[in-house]
């Protein structure tokens, strides 16, 4: 779970480091942003398990690991870092900081910083190995994501959702659409 919080913490730094503050020095602004991120980051619920399979041009990539959730800067992220290589991570990002409390369906969209629709989520699959970084992300045509809530347990199963390759990172045959399938279980508490 600490790995998930670290990944979210680093991501939050990237999003807030460019925050405009013309009255302070750059060092003071960065310090203020770091304090804001630290104070707003919290683990949510109890960790479960996740298994994700991504297929691109006949190659299969898998993530098996702990499924956990954190809130930071007003948004919730459910993440599954791989047990054997934590920089290989699947993430679901919500536009609010609330875990699904009842069985719910969300529209998957392309990441938009100004989106505040509580029914929207974004998906990403990232493999940040230094030799061949690969990233795939959802777009506005990816589809729907359903969460089934049964008491304390929250489950999400999906199959054959299409993700778009990052043109910057994915090279050669990996610079193509991919399909992703998975099963996640997380607990409210």
Short names for language-model regions:
Residues 2-8:
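Sec-dependent signal peptide recognition
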Residues 14-17:
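C-terminal motif of bacterial Sec signal peptides marking the signal peptidase cleavage site
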Residues 19-22:
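Bacterial signal peptide processing site
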Residues 27-52:
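Post-signal peptide N-terminal segment of mature Sec-exported envelope proteins
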Residues 48-69:
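N-terminal small/polar-rich segments of proteins
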Residues 69-151, 164:
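Surface-exposed helix/loop patches within compact recognition domains
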Residues 148-189:
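C-terminal or internal capping secondary-structure element at the end of a domain, subdomain, or sheet
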């Amino acid at each position: 779970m600490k790995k998930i919080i670290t990944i979210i913490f680093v991501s939050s730094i990237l999003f807030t480091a460019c925050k405009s503050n013309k009255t302070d020095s750059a060092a003071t602004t960065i310090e203020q942003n770091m304090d804001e991120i630290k104070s707003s980051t919290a683990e949510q619920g109890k960790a479960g398990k996740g298994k994700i399979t991504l297929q691109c041009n006949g190659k299969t990539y898998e993530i098996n690991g702990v499924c956990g959730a954190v809130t930071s800067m007003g948004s919730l992220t459910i993440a599954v870092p791989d047990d054997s290589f934590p920089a290989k991570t699947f993430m679901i990002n919500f536009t609010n900081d609330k875990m699904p409390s009842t069985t719910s369906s969300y529209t998957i969209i392309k990441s938009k910083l100004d989106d505040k629709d509580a029914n929207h989520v974004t998906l990403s699959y990232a493999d940040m190995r230094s030799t061949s970084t690969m990233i795939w992300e959802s777009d506005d045509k990816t589809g729907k994501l359903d969460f089934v809530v049964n008491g304390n347990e929250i489950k999400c199963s999906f199959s054959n959702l299409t993700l778009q390759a990052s043109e910057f990172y994915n090279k050669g045959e990996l610079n193509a659409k991919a399909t992703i399938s998975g099963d996640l279980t997380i607990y409210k508490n």
